[in-house]
């Protein structure tokens, strides 16, 4: 951290950190989308910056003898100013519920549509998968020339899903994927509130604890 960054007010430090995280995520998606990149987590540690990459094909992201990961690490240091990046690549299929990643669902829909499967059928399959995975809430939107020459969209929603506010921005997961078919480009947007998510306005009131009574002989 530079001397200028150390002198920044707290709120500006937070803004700078969030901006850098956004830039890292954008770079990773741009660089690795063709290798099965799904999502990433960026964590500040005393030793530097830990970056966890979730992917469908981890070996392609790592590269032969780690060449691709080393290249990404060098760019993060030299171009984005990331301090000591430590990159871990995790196979998303080995996670307990990969359906909690919206990009996994969006890619499944896009791939099925590219194979000629009707969009409504694919959407309902995705709904069943998300419900079976225990999602708290979700929204699936497919837009494009669905049944006429004019572009329109079809939307399916379920459960509790905030679309504005802190929770919508920082806790609800969102992904957008595009697929090019003969009629034109289609957009697939997926928002998911994971099963583990606890909204800011949700709280549990613990029942009062009864005092223990002791009898004296």
From Swiss-Prot:
What the record says about family reads: Belongs to the universal ribosomal protein uS3 family.
User: What protein name applies here?
Assistant: Small ribosomal subunit protein uS3
Matching PROSITE patterns: KH_TYPE_2
> What are the entry keywords?
Ribonucleoprotein, Ribosomal protein, RNA-binding, rRNA-binding
Single GO molecular function: structural constituent of ribosome
Q: Which gene encodes it?
A: rps3
Q: What region holds the KH type-2 domain?
A: 24-93
For this record, the Gene Ontology CC terms, alphabetical, are: cytosolic small ribosomal subunit
């Amino acid at each position: 951290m530079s001397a200028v960054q150390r002198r920044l007010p707290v709120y500006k430090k937070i803004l700078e950190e969030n901006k850098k995280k956004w830039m890292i995520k954008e770079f990773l998606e741009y660089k690795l989308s063709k290798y099965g990149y799904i999502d990433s987590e960026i964590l500040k540690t005393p030793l530097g910056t830990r970056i966890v990459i979730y992917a469908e094909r981890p070996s392609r992201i790592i590269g032969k003898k780690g060449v691709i990961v080393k290249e990404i690490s060098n760019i993060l240091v030299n171009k984005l100013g990331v301090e000591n990046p430590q990159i871990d690549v995790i196979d998303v299929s080995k996670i307990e519920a990969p359906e909690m990643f919206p990009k996994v669902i969006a890619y499944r829909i896009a791939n099925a549509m590219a194979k000629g499967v009707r969009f409504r059928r694919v959407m309902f399959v995705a709904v069943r998968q998300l419900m079976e995975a225990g999602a708290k809430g979700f929204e699936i939107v497919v837009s494009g020339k669905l049944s006429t020459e004019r572009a329109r969209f079809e939307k399916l929603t379920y459960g509790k899903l905030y679309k504005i506010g802190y929770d919508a921005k920082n806790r609800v997961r969102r992904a957008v994927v595009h697929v090019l078919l003969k009629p034109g480009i289609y957009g697939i947007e997926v928002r998911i509130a994971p099963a583990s998510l606890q909204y800011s306005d949700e709280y549990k009131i613990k029942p009062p604890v009864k005092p223990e009574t002791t009898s004296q002989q």
